[in-house]
Amino acid sequence: MNNVLRGEYVENMVAALLAPHWVQPWKSNHEWSLWDLERKRGGRTEKLEIKQSARMQPWGPVRSPPRFDIAPKRDFNRLDEPPCRRADAYVFAWHAEVGDAADHRDPAQWVFFVAATRSLPPDQKTVSLGWLRRNATQVGFDQLPAVLDAALTQMTRRR
């Protein structure tokens, strides 16, 4: 599965797990969306970014350590505003399987990391898998909804 298709697949896999409360905010042009999923809760809209990486690529296994994009984004409808991270939280998905057993479609083969946006390094454009293992909450697919809810609830209480 190529990177673009895998990214869309993982976004939709997570969206299906978090439905019906979380929805995709875009109607037809999701490439321009500033976040991947959103939900209304407590009078506000919570926004979620989903990032993914996999060791197995179409050309074979990658040996370099994975990095996940967290760069601030510009809202092209408001070019006068500086770029920023628009989501409240990030879900990072890592697929480490290689060889014939690797199946990007299998949620059980993915490891997920949940991080509040404000916990991300403010001056970095990417984070490594090592950083996520040290600083984010690692979960399996089935635990993702509960851990994400807990992280966002804790974040809301700190405001």
Language-model-detected regions and their locations in the chain:
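Nucleic-acid endonuclease domains
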Residues: 1-46, 51-159
